[in-house]
Amino acid sequence: MSSQSDAIHPIPAYAHAPVLLLIIGFLMLQPLSTDLYLASLPSLATVFGVPASTVQLTLSMFVAGFGGAQLIIGPLSDRYGRRPVLLVGLALYVIASLLCAAAPGIDLLIVARFLQALGCCSAIIIARAIVRDAYAPADSARVIARASSWLSLAPLLGPILGSYLQVTFGWRAAFVAHSILGACLLAAVYLRLPETNVHKNPRATELAGLIHNFGVVLGAREFWANALPGALSYGSIFAFISGSSLVLIRVLHVPTAWFGYCFAFGVSGYLGGTIVCRRLLPKFGQATTQRIGSAMSLAAGALFLAALGLGAAHWSLVVGAMFLT
């Protein structure tokens, strides 16, 4: 019979550092999957001869696939284990990334992006599950915090790297980079990551249980109080993400090589806000801190609309509004 310590730490202590590196890689997969090809959106519209709204479906379908997969990845890993679900998910990510890179038309690219999201989601969901499996509860929060500090580099460096890939190699290069990153993670999981779910639940995927659990969550007022502000904030961020390159490069004539820096500056406001939030939470509490943040976002958006109403149209206005929002 396994001891309680074994149940909490199925991974040997000497392997914790490689596991932490893997967790960082898993968490970086999602922002890099979106940010790395943003500078290529105007080029995609030109190459395939489609309107900007069609090109933006490559991002919308990724978000839809990523969101939907969260409902099934967790239960599947609870039943079959983290390792097999992760291996299948990363293999799907690599194949889908190669399909994106080789896509002869926009239709296949949109479908491949949806499949890419399914594989990407497995890495994100299982990364957090591995933390719960491999680390004691007192340590898991610190592990996530440490991984998240490295994660902040992805939305800062991803668009910059993607801009140079677009300028140097064209739009397919970003998806080739995705496939290389996915293949490296797949090899690392296969060679280095043992199974961390030592107590598999054969009933985790039963439909009745899933429906009951979803009902409990959806019926909780606390869930909606926290989920709705987060969803609205997330939606506004993706509205900027999906249109930023098209507006900055096509409309405001920002050079493609400079797009990544503009985007990174806007994202730095989000990262700075998280630092400020951590300082405000102990002093004001969650509810008051959320009100302060919401009021600042509303004020920034209103100032942006007022500036547009006065006829101002400059790339710095767009980037500045995103930084403040």
Predicted regions and their residues:
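Conserved MFS/SLC helix-loop-helix module at the cytosolic interface between two early adjacent transmembrane helices
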Residues: 68-107
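Structural signature of the two symmetry-related core transmembrane helices
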Residues: 84-98, 179, 289-304
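Helix-loop-helix hairpin linking two adjacent transmembrane segments in secondary transporters
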Residues: 104, 108, 145-191
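Cytoplasmic helix-loop-helix junction between adjacent transmembrane helices
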Residues: 112-153
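C-terminal transmembrane helical hairpin of 12-TM major facilitator-type secondary transporters
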Residues: 290-325
